From Swiss-Prot:
This is Trigger factor. The gene is tig. It catalyses: [protein]-peptidylproline (omega=180) = [protein]-peptidylproline (omega=0). Its main location: cytoplasm. One of its GO terms (molecular function) is peptidyl-prolyl cis-trans isomerase activity. PANTHER family: TRIGGER FACTOR CHAPERONE AND PEPTIDYL-PROLYL CIS/TRANS ISOMERASE, TRIGGER FACTOR-LIKE PROTEIN TIG, CHLOROPLASTIC. GO terms for biological process: 'de novo' cotranslational protein folding; cell division; chaperone-mediated protein folding; protein transport; protein unfolding. Keywords: Cell cycle, Cell division, Chaperone, Cytoplasm, Isomerase, Rotamase. Transmembrane segments: none annotated.
Length: 491
């Protein structure tokens, strides 16, 4: 086999691989010898079929198998021998001339193919001890814990039917039918819907008009959907709702005690407080982690500047661009609405894609040199988390990870990255700084000052800058529920 380098520009490589016809013939003969005793051909005793006849019957199919095996296995072998790592799967090109291909299958012509790929650049690791990051820490006040417990208690409170008029804080049970221009619309009907007046779950003006109703009342109210309502056919439209009040119930007093904790499956109010405090700490800890990681990656980005594989950047950019356009479409906006142009946005997100790829390669190299490993147990926990997020789809998810090339790597990658970040944080200077909740949740100054206003969901695309995403964009208030158009989907 002969390997000839025909292109070496930057990270791009192209190789011509030539396997002589006589070598292909030898391989085919070896394969024919292996099958000679196993094949059954009419007119011949087992093991007595002449090689020439075997070649006539099976030669081309065996040669096709050999070609496929060579194309499958040789690229890795060749790159390993050259001390190179391909950024993506090498592109293999063979002759498209049928006559030439037929000669190859008959071992009458050399088998030639080309490999086109980009190498992963050699990365010389730099001293990271000069990196300094600030870890913002929030001291959780007792009042905040109590407020959260109060919200939990409110969500778990009971209601008792009452006679008389509904007031704010009461729960009404209603049937309703929504109409625009006298015609019922999709999602505008529900039965036995429970609504706490004053909760602002429904669109503006809906709940206010139910104050004062009694069980058995029938009433038609008129409301106007917000101009930015996600359902375009309803946005800004005036609608009527025919309402039948089936029950009015008053809320029982809120009591935060062991009985409440027992209802929630806990042994005591103290345990409830402990869990709530832990949840708040976890929420703030997640934001702290994101901001520390962003600082770390920003400084790594300044330390490392090298050419990135174009194919990796293209693939990353396409992922970002697809998400950006999806977010714009869902928001009903254009690039012009965000004070930018498509061309400018493409340039911005192209830079982001390059940064993602570059930092990914750097973290990979650091992790490899540091011996960072992702254990089977960690992979299993990650898989179980995926299953937990999609109840009822466990089999499909398991099949996907079992049968899809690269699926397991998609589970491993974020785990590996977080462990590399942990490794780096153990080496760099980390200074704790006590801040308020508002200070912790504030956007980074750098993100508040883009060259131009970023397109919709800039933060969504910027997630890889910190590995973990910043806080998700707030849901649209008064979004239509799948079943109840009047209901706020963010309930």
């Amino acid at each position: 086999m002969q390997v000839i380098e025909t292109l070496a520009e930057g990270l791009k490589r192209e190789l011509k691989v030539v396997i002589p016809a006589d070598e292909m013939q030898t391989r085919m003969n070896e394969r024919l010898a292996d099958v000679k005793d196993r094949v059954r051909i009419n007119g011949f005793r087992p093991g007595k079929v002449p090689v020439a006849h075997l070649k006539k019957v099976y030669g081309k199919s065996i040669m096709a198998e050999l070609v496929n095996e060579i194309v499958r296995d040789k690229p890795t072998e060749i790159l390993t021998s050259r001390g190179e790592k391909s950024a993506t799967q090498p592109e293999v090109a063979m002759t498209e001339d049928e006559a030439e291909a037929d000669k190859i299958l008959k071992a009458e012509a050399d088998f030639e193919f080309t490999l086109a790929y980009e190498i992963i650049p050699a990365i010389e690791l730099k001293d990271a001890t000069g990196i300094k990051v600030t870890r913002e820490v929030v001291e959780i006040a007792e009042d905040e814990v109590n407020e959260q417990i109060l919200r939990i208690a409110e969500s778990a409170r009971t209601y008792e039917s009452k006679k008389g008029k509904a007031a704010n804080g009461d729960r009404v049970t209603i049937d309703y039918l929504g109409k625009v221009d006298g015609v019922a619309f999709d999602g505008g009907k529900d039965e036995d819907a429970e609504l706490v007046l004053g909760s602002n779950r429904f669109i503006p003006g809906f709940e206010e008009q139910l104050v004062g109703v009694k069980a058995g009342d029938e009433k038609t109210i008129t409301v106007t959907f917000p101009a930015d309502y996600p359902a375009a056919n309803l946005a800004g439209k005036e609608a009527t709702f025919d309402i039948t009040v089936k029950d009015v119930a008053a809320a029982a007093p809120i009591e935060i005690n062991d009985e409440l904790a027992t209802k929630l499956g806990l042994e005591s109010a103290d345990k409830l407080k402990e869990i709530v405090r832990g949840q708040i700490e976890s929420q703030y800890g997640s934001v702290t982690r994101q901001k520390v990681k962003r600082q770390l990656l920003d400084q790594l980005d300044e330390l490392y500047q090298f050419e990135t594989p174009e194919r990796l950047v293209n693939a990353e950019f396409e992922n970002i661009w697809r998400q950006i356009n999806t977010d714009l479409e869902q928001a009903g906006k254009t690039f012009a609405d965000e004070d930018t142009t498509e061309e400018e946005a493409r340039a911005e997100y192209r830079k982001l894609a390059e940064r993602r790829v570059r930092l990914g390669l750097v973290l990979s190299e650091i992790g490899e040199k540091a011996g960072v490993q992702v254990s089977d147990d960690e992979m299993q926990r990650s898989l179980f988390e995926q299953l937990r997020q999609f109840p009822g789809q466990e089999k499909q998810i398991l099949d996907y990870f079992k049968n899809t090339p690269g699926a397991a790597a998609s589970l491993r990658a974020p785990l590996f990255e977080e462990k590399v970040v942990d490794h780096l944080l153990s080496e760099v200077a980390v200074t704790d700084k006590t801040v308020s909740k508002d200070e912790l949740m504030a956007e980074d100054e750098a993100e508040d000052k883009p060259a131009k206003k970023a397109p919709a969901k800039k933060k969504a695309a910027a997630k890889a800058e910190a590995g973990e995403g910043e806080e998700a964009a707030a849901p649209k208030k008064k979004a239509p529920a799948k079943k109840k158009a009047a209901d706020d989907s963010a309930e």
